[in-house]
């Protein structure tokens, strides 16, 4: 998964010419994207750390990408890997060929399939100009395939990342530290899974519907509806743990379930008491069902009380007749 250090490219907040440097396309491929705001400088002198501002959308791949490349037969002697030149209407494809000196054989490696390529695309292998005196480049055969997958966004670093584009990436949104601000409606895609780690914040300007919801952080600015809630028992029962907190309303969709990532720990915490999994200032609507693996006591269950979703294990009652 590639890591994007926003301050390294000048895509940080505050300069008058910031929008002149916005990329035309910012596509998140199958492996996803990490944005680390730890070194996002607020000024050109790099004397203070500021927030990162993305005025563009983080998009899912569209159209077709480069699926495979077949290099031509060897016509010279090469000393190492070579980049492949890709020309066409699309963008984002990156590939090279490894060269086996003993076997005199090329092995193509596609780092990114790119998107929006068509049959007019050309892929070229540079000729071994220095070694055999030839010039120009040799054309490679290739195949295209529909872009069916897209990764997610992981936000790291203490400073904020502000999104101003209507994003369409299809993977999970993960806020590991600091604040991720969805500054316009759609900046955080609806329907994607959402993880907000302890101490992190997702700030919204509109309501958001997500798939699986997970974490111990905070969500403010909008109502949240989730299809499922993901529970980590170790985190929930940790000393000083606080629940996922929604400043507005949290709604569990019909048929929503609570699923544990570490179900083996139900036995570990069977005497751990009641813990809050989620809290909403404007109440919680809908009641999810706790999924219990085979062999786990049905005494475990979730319920709502005073704007909280609680997990508990009901202890049996012993009646003694005298």
Where in this protein do the model-derived segments appear?
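Feature for peripheral, non-core segments
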Residues: 1-157
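Short, T/G/N/S-enriched strand-turn elements that build extracellular solenoid repeat scaffolds
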Residues: 5-9, 14-16, 35-39, 152-155, ...
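Short, structured interface segments
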Residues: 140-146, 224, 307-312
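Extracellular beta-strand/loop-rich repeat segments of large surface/secreted proteins
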Residues: 200-274, 282, 313
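Glycine-rich active-site loop/lid that clamps phosphate-bearing ligands
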Residues: 282-297
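Extracellular disulfide-bonded cysteine-rich modules/repeats
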Residues: 298-302
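Enriched but not universal
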Residues: 315-322
């Amino acid at each position: 998964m590639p890591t994007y250090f926003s301050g390294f490219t000048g895509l940080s907040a505050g300069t008058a010419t910031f929008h002149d440097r916005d990329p035309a396309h910012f596509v998140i491929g199958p492996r996803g994207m990490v944005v680390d705001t730890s070194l996002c400088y607020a000024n050109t002198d790099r004397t203070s750390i500021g927030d990162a501002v993305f005025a563009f959308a983080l998009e899912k791949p569209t159209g077709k990408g480069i699926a495979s490349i077949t290099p031509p037969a060897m016509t010279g002697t090469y000393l190492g890997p070579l980049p492949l030149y890709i020309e066409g209407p699309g963008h984002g494809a990156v590939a090279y060929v490894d060269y086996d000196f003993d076997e005199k054989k090329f092995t193509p490696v596609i780092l990114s399939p790119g998107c929006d390529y068509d049959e007019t695309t050309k892929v070229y292998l540079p000729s071994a100009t220095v070694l055999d005196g030839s010039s120009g480049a040799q054309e490679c055969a290739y195949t295209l395939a529909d872009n069916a997958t897209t990764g997610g966004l992981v936000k790291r670093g203490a400073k904020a990342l502000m999104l101003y584009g209507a994003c369409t990436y299809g993977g999970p949104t993960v806020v590991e530290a600091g604040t991720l601000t969805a500054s316009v409606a759609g900046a955080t895609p609806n329907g994607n899974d959402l993880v907000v780690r302890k101490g992190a914040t997702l700030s919204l300007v509109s309501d958001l519907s997500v798939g699986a919801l997970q974490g111990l952080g905070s969500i403010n600015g909008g109502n949240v509806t989730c299809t499922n809630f993901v529970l980590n028992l170790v985190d929930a029962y940790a000393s000083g743990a606080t629940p996922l907190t929604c400043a507005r309303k949290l709604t569990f969709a019909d048929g929503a379930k609570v699923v544990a990532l570490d179900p083996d720990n139900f036995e570990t915490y069977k005497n751990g008491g009641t813990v809050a999994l989620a809290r909403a200032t404007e109440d919680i609507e809908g009641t999810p069902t706790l999924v219990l693996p085979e062999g786990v006591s049905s005494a475990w269950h979730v319920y709502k009380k005073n704007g909280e979703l609680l997990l508990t294990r009901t202890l049996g009652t012993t009646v003694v007749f005298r």
